[in-house]
Amino acid sequence: MAGQIDPIRAELVGWTPRVPRNLLASLPPLGRKTAPKLPQNISFSPPLSAHPCYQCQEKCLPHRRPVSWSPLILQRCRLRCLPRGHPLKISRTFELPVGERDGSHPLTAFARAPRTTEPRSLHYLYDSLPPTPALCAQLLFHQLIQGHFSFVVHPTVATAPRSIWPAKMSRFSTGRLLAQNLFQAFNKPVFPSATPVWTRAFSQTAARRDADSESSAKLMESLTRGIVGMAADPTDLTGDKLATNIGLRDTEDEPYHFHIYSHKHNTHITVTKPNRDALISLSCGNLGFKKSNRKHYDSAYQLGAYVVDKMHQMNLHNKIKKMEVVLRGFGPGREAVIKVLLGNEGRMLRSSIVRVSDATRLKFGGTRSKKPRRLG
């Protein structure tokens, strides 16, 4: 693999170049790893072929026939040694295959591009070119971009008109021009609109959220308006409206509560008003059961029957329209008190029960439990 693509910054990391060493010497370091160190005495010039053109007698790139450009580059130079100021038409100069004459190949789009000094896309770079050596340099640059730096989709290169080009394009000036264009291509930022989705950085996803920004703004505006309106009109926050606004249930709809707390040592029963004020609160110890006698099923059953009888004495069975039974713990008194409510003792309270809930406390982690008691 020639290089590893970093999708966050779209740059080459740990790349192994396949370009000539003299061209690699002029490239800037890319990514977080620098290019390998090369000898500094290597001059920069386009790669030359073994045989020069029979007309212009210059050794140039089109004679090499690279593998990637084999259907495009011919064996001899097609420039016909035109004068320096002659506008070149690449679509007429190069003989393209039949399947690539419809403009699909990048080289066919360079013939009618407008002349300008502004930065432009690579596909509109070759409006007019100087003769053979500069053309070799530009073609080499195009091959470098397409073959080895394919993650840059539309590199922008600043070109200049032919009037400011040197009169004689030597190998040294051609190399400097190629290096300058190459540096500008990698120094300019690659905008998200010019890159595919898979090369965008994760920090450039704001454009995808623009579609929902209007609805989010409307939601925030309505929420702010409601809060400001409540603060501006304090009369709405009094009385029953306050309970409605903060989500509290009306106390008139709250039922009475019949709490049964049973653990392995005792059983507690508490009857409360809707506002949580206690009416009756008794345990097995209040009935005369001492020590270990408080944990048995019979003591809990007697406690339940006593509490129900006391509720009848207080005429609570006529006052209570709604009652909630709240169970807590898994001791033997749990089933005993339920038997009382379902039996003959609780026949006058059974019809007022509207809800049965369990309030047993469960630890998720929590404090450390007591060590188990072991006898013997």
Swiss-Prot record:
Pfam families (alphabetical): Ribosomal_S11 (PF00411)
Keyword vocabulary terms for this entry: Mitochondrion, Ribonucleoprotein, Ribosomal protein
GO biological process terms held by the UniProt record: translation
Superkingdom of the organism of origin: Eukaryota
Gene Ontology CC terms, in alphabetical order: mitochondrial small ribosomal subunit
Gene Ontology MF term list: structural constituent of ribosome
SUPFAM superfamilies according to UniProt: Translational machinery components (SSF53137)
Localization: Mitochondrion
Quaternary structure note: Component of the mitochondrial small ribosomal subunit (mt-SSU). Mature N.crassa 74S mitochondrial ribosomes consist of a small (37S) and a large (54S) subunit. The 37S small subunit contains a 16S ribosomal RNA (16S mt-rRNA) and 32 different proteins. The 54S large subunit contains a 23S rRNA (23S mt-rRNA) and 42 different proteins.
Protein role: Component of the mitochondrial ribosome (mitoribosome), a dedicated translation machinery responsible for the synthesis of mitochondrial genome-encoded proteins, including at least some of the essential transmembrane subunits of the mitochondrial respiratory chain. The mitoribosomes are attached to the mitochondrial inner membrane and translation products are cotranslationally integrated into the membrane.
Recorded family membership: Belongs to the universal ribosomal protein uS11 family.
Name by which UniProt lists this protein: Small ribosomal subunit protein uS11m
Species name: Neurospora crassa (strain ATCC 24698 / 74-OR23-1A / CBS 708.71 / DSM 1257 / FGSC 987)
